[in-house]
Amino acid sequence: MDRMSRPFTYGAIILGLLPSFRLINTALSNRFDVQLPDSTFQFEYPGAMVSDKHFLPDPPANYLPVENPTLSFWHENLHELHDARSTPDLPPTSDVVIIGAGYAGIATAYHLKKGERRNNLSVTVLEARGICSGATGRNGGHLRPDMYGHIPKYIERAGVKAGLEIAEFEVAHLEAIKKLIEKEKIDCDFTLTRTVDVWINKTAAIKAREVYDLMSSRNLAYMDDVFFSRSEDAENISGIKGAQACATYTAGTLSPYKLILRLAEILVEEKLVNIQTNTPVTSVTPDPRGGFIITTPRGTTHANKVIYANNAHVAGLLPEYQNAIVPCKGICSHITV
């Protein structure tokens, strides 16, 4: 397991948690491992953390959300908890403070409080805007394992074992999220379907076939679900003229906003988590007495542990990651026929 890559791969960075941490998944999977011999929870401390801030670069100046952001399709009908604050003021202290109320942040809070190894930790979630207002509320709503797009790159960079582990992790999300939705009876327009990857470049098609053969040779159970086609069959199956190859496999669609807001609603209804929206974190500093002081425009709060789940904006608080976690703009369209 690559200790350096795990925190960014799965969307959350853990600060101040124990060195024996093993983070398998900060998303909505039962593989999220929070266990310790003393029955608290276990995290792997990121090797890149640097305590001496004199050696750190200055944080990016533009990491806070912009004013008047573009309205996402998912936000046309805002949930009543979108701008929720569990209490009028910030709690003075918490066992755990999670920065970010998107997929990673709310899912982490859910697992800490309602997972198989639930505990009595006090948890506060701080969000710069509304719940699910960042990347989670602005994606295409696809639960689509990345079977080919980046897996070859991961294999080349980190080896076959690491690349296939990421593929297995993504595939496992489908069933994990399906079970979660069924367990909590979440109405989020969830649908299981088939997706198709298409290659119209001959060289890329050959490379895709090599990846398919490599992954198939590993006796991975999920590869039984992948159907790979070449040449004329690829055109007929995909409907794309000139297709040199295609692969189909199970995927899903859902409303990410409805999913995450329902999880947040469950946590709020059961008074398991204190959620504070429109509360951007401007700094996190060690407290000489132990733990950390989190500063916001609304005041400060103390935490024994801090979980960074603010995705692309994490370098604003942890500048040592500014060359490792780089925000990128993308375009996602809602098309009706």
Residue ranges and their predicted role:
Residues G115-R138:
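Glycine-rich FAD pyrophosphate-binding loop
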Residues Y154-I266:
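Rossmann-like flavin
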Residues K241-A303:
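Helical element adjacent to the flavin cofactor pocket in flavoenzyme catalytic cores
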Residues G140-L143, Y148, R194-D197, Q322-V337:
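Central beta-strand plus flanking loop segment that forms part of the substrate or channel wall
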Residues I99, P145, Y308-A309:
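Redox-cofactor binding/interface segments in oxidoreductases and associated redox assembly factors
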Residues G100-I106, A128:
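Glycine-rich Rossmann-fold phosphate-binding loop(s) that bind the pyrophosphate
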Residues D2-V96, K114-L121:
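Extreme N-terminal leader/targeting segments of oxidoreductases
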Residues T296-V337:
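Central helical "cap/lid" subdomain
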